Every structure is written in structure tokens, then in C-alpha cells.
């Protein structure tokens, strides 16, 4: 992907930033823990790490593998909550984007938005 930059700000409402992201040559993911719930920062960190690991070990990246990566992360979060009851209710959003050939593929869960910046114009996908 060309010209990818990651930046996260805490904003004006929350005391803690629960955003996490990773950027590789052809894959990007952003997660945002559910603020106001216990473990939002843990969920977002866990999710982005699991998505990254899953996709980096997947031989073929396509729409199905992006969805599978999010489902895999969700399963890992659910399993962790089962082991640590204090984390009950934790959750996160996720947006995953991959460049495959000349196409951008994406998958998301939750209310995080995806935008494309092209020709000096920002458009929500």
C-alpha cells in the first residue's frame, strides 16, 4: 500500500486511549476497545495481535480470510473472558484492509469507520 500512516489520539471524552493498529506491506488493521467497559484496551490489543498473527500465517489473503481473522480474534477474546471473569463484557471494534493485486479488500465489525483518501478527497466506505 502507498503512504500509510498510523496515528491515534485520546480525544476529549475518554481518560484512556483504547485504539490499536498494525501496518504491514499489504495489510492494515485498526481496533478500538469499547470505552466504558472493563478490558476495552485488553480486547483491542488482543484483537489486533490475533488478526496480525492470523493473516501473516495465512497463505492466501482474500475477503474470506479477512473475516476469518476477525472471527479468530473474537474466539480468542471469548476464550480469555471465560478464563478471566473480571474481563466479562470487554469488546472491541475492528477494521482490516488488505491490498491484493490492484484491489483493496476490507472487513469490519463494530462502529469504526473506514475512509479512502484519493484525489484530495476523503470518502467514507
Feature locations, PLM:
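PP2C/PPM-type serine/threonine phosphatase catalytic domain
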Residues: 1-125
Amino acid at each position: 500500500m502507498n503512504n500509510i500512516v498510523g496515528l491515534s489520539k485520546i480525544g476529549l471524552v475518554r481518560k484512556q486511549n483504547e485504539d490499536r493498529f498494525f501496518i504491514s506491506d499489504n495489510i492494515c488493521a485498526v481496533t478500538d476497545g469499547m470505552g466504558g467497559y472493563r478490558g476495552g484496551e485488553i480486547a483491542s490489543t488482543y484483537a489486533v495481535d490475533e488478526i496480525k498473527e492470523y493473516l501473516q500465517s495465512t497463505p492466501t489473503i482474500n475477503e474470506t480470510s479477512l473475516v476469518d481473522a476477525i472471527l479468530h480474534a473474537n474466539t480468542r477474546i471469548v476464550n480469555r473472558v471465560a478464563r478471566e471473569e473480571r474481563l466479562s463484557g470487554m469488546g472491541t471494534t475492528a477494521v482490516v484492509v488488505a491490498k491484493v493485486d490492484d484491489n483493496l479488500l476490507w472487513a469490519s465489525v463494530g462502529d469504526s469507520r473506514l475512509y479512502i483518501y484519493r484525489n484530495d478527497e476523503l470518502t467514507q466506505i
